[in-house]
Amino acid sequence: MTLETSDLTGDVQGVKPSLNVTVFGISAVVILAVSLASIFAPNTVQSLFDATVTWTSKWFGWFYILLITAAIVFVIVLALTRFGNIKLGPNNSTPDFSTFSWAAMLFAAGIGTSIMFYAIAEPVGQYIAPPTGEGETIEAARQAVTWTLFHYGISGWALYGLVGIALGYFAYRKHDRLTVRSTLRPLLGDKIDGIFGDIIDMFALVGGVFGIAASLGIGVVQLNVGLTIIFGIPQGLVAQIGLVSLSVIMATVSAVSGVDKGVRMLSSINVFLAMFLALWVLITGNTTFLLDALVANVGDFVTQFPVLTLETFPYQRPDEWMNAWTLFFWAWWITWAAFVGMFLARISRGRTIRQFVIGTLTLPFTYVLVWVSIFGNSAIDLIRSGNVEFTKIAYATPEGGLYALLDALPLGKILIAIALFVGVLFYVTSSDSGALVMANLSMRNLPDRQDGVAWLRVFWATLTGALTITMLLAGGISILQQATIVMALPFSFVLILIAAALWKALRSEASKATARTRAITSGLISMSGTAAGRVRLSWQDRLSRTFDAVSPTRAKRALDNRVVPALEAVGTRLQEEGLVSEILIEGSEAHDPDDDRRFLGRASLVVSATPEVMEQLIARLLDVPISGATIDAESFRYVVRMIVMPVPTFGATLSDEDDTTVRLEVRPHGGGQGYDIMNWTADQVAHDVLDHFERWVEYLGATSTVE
C-alpha cells in the first residue's frame, strides 16, 4: 500500500455549473468592439493592425519561432524520459477509445478547409515568390512543398500536444476541471479560481475566436468560389454572409436538437471523400512524378527541419513573407492550441504521455504530408508544364486554385462538386466545434464530460461569424491573418506557464513515486507479517486466506471492528501532535469511476496540517532543517476500500458469477495494484498507516528541499 494525497483540485461535485460572467462578458465586449470598429472604421482598423503586426514581427518574431521550437523539444523530452510512462488518468485507467478509433480521430484532426486552401496556395506562392533566391526554379519547386510541410507539420501539433498533455494530466490524473486555468494550479495555487484564472481563460477564448475567424474567413472565400463555379452564385458579401449564416444555423441545430452524432457521422464520411479526392489526383495526374516527389519531400523535410524551425532570416529578412507565412502560421497554431488541445485531451484519456506524443506528432502529419505533397506538387507540375490559365488563377486568386486544379483532371466538374461538399462540411463542423469549446470556457464548475449550455454555443457561433464577415469587409483574408498574429501574443506567454506548471507537477509526481516505492515495499513486508508489531502467518494460513471467500457482512464487520478503530487511534494520536485528522466512512456512492469492479464502501483517514506544523514535524522526524522552505503540504489519505472480487480458481474449473469474495483493499491514489488487509489486526493496520505516514512526511521533506 501507499499513501493517498489530495491534489487540491477544487472538486466541483455537487456544485452547479454556471456562467462565468467575467470571462464571458469581457471576451464578448472585446470581440464585439473589434467587429463594430471593422464596420464603422475599416481603414482605421486596417492601419492599426498594420502597425501592430509590424511592431509584433520586429520585437516578437524571434519569440514566436523560439516558442514553437521549445514546444517541440519539450514534448519529445516528455515522451523519451520516465515521464512518458505516466498516464493521462489514474494508473489503472484504460483508454476510452480503441487504438484504431483513437488513431482515426487523430488522423482526421489533420483535415480541414484550411488545408484544402493552403495545400495549393502556399506551394504555388513559395514556388513563384520564395523567401530567398529566384522563383520558378527547380530549387524553388523543392523548397515550396518543404516550406508548406514545415508550416503545416509537426511544429503546430507539438503545440497542440503540449496543451493536450497538460489538460489531460490535470483533468484526468489530478481530477481538476478540464479548463486552461487548471493547468496552472502548480504555479498559482488557488489563485486560478479567481481573477488570475479568469484572465488566463480570457486570453485563450479571445485568441481562439480570432484563430477560428481566420479559418472561417479562408473557408468562406474559398467556398464562395466553388458556389460560383457549380451554381453560378456571384462572389461577394451576400454569398459570404449566407455561408456564415449556415455555420451559425448548424451550430444552433447541433446544440438545440442534439444531432451532434449525425454531424460527426457526416464528418467521418467527409474524411473518406477527402482521401478519395487525393487518390483521384494521384491516379489521374502525373502519378510517377507525384510518387517521386512524395519521397523527395519526406527527405527534404527531415533533413531541413532543424534549420527551418529556427530560421529568423536575420541577415536578409523578408518581412512581408514572414508575416504572411511563418509568423501567421505560428500565431494561428497558438490561437487554436487551447481548442484542439482540449479535443486531444478528451479523446486520449487513459493513454500514456509517450503514446499521446507519438500519436499527435505522427498521425495528423501523415495526412498533411500526403495531401500537401499530392496537391502541391500537382499544382507546381501544371505551372511548369506551361498551363498559364492555372498559374494565373492559383497565384492571383489562391482561393480558386483547388477548383482550377480539379477542373484540369478527368470528371473535373464532379470533383469540384465533391470538393465543395467536403469544404462546406469541414467549414460548418469547425464552426460548431469551436463554438462548443468557447461555451465551455465561458462556464464555471463545468464537469469534464459535460458541455456548455446550448444558448452559449449559439451566441459564440454567431459572434465569431459576425467577426469573420466584418473583418473580411475591412481587409479580406490578410487582415484576419494580421489579427491572428496580434491576438496570439498574450496566450503565447500562457503556454510558457503551462509548460512550467506541467514540468513541476511531473517532477513532483516522480518524487512521490520514489516514496511510493518504499511504501509498497513496506506494505509487501507487512502482508507476510514481518514488519514491526505484526505476527507472521504460517504459509498454510496465508494460502487459505487467498482462496477462502469473504462475505460482504464479514468484510464490513472487519472494517468496523478492526480498521476503523485503528484509523481512529492513529488520528487521535496525530491530533495530539498538532495535526488535523478526520475519519470518513462512505458507502457505495463513493465509487471510483476509474475502477470497474463492484464497490461496497470505504473508510478513510485524512490528515492535514498548517505549513508551520509540517515544518516542525519534518524537522523532528527527518532531522532536516527546512525553515523558510516551501512545503507542498497536500493532505495525507489512507483509504481502505471494500471491493468485490471473483474467488481465485485454477485448472479447468471456472468461477460462477456468485463465486465472489470481498477484499479490504488499500490502493494508491494514482491507481495501481493494491493489497488486501482483510485478516490484519487493528495493530497491524495502525502500523501500516504509520509506515505510509512516515513515507508521506519523507516525500514532503524531499520536495520542500528540492524546490
Positions of the model-derived regions?
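N-terminal alpha-helical transmembrane segments of multi-pass membrane transport
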Residues: 2-140, 256, 506, 593
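Helix-loop-helix connectors at the membrane interface of multi-pass transporters/channels
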Residues: 4-18, 177-195, 219-242, 272-277, ...
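Membrane-water interface regions at transmembrane-helix termini and the short interhelical loops
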Residues: 10-16, 41-56, 75-96, 144-151, ...
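Transmembrane-helix boundary/entry motifs in multi-pass membrane transporters
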Residues: 13-22, 57-61, 91-109, 145-154, ...
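Helix-loop-helix module between adjacent transmembrane segments
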Residues: 14-25, 29-39, 72-77, 111-116, ...
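Loop-to-transmembrane helix boundary motifs in multi-pass membrane proteins
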Residues: 16-31, 189-198, 233-252, 256, ...
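Extracellular/periplasmic helix-exit of transmembrane alpha-helices
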Residues: 118-130, 281-304, 365-396
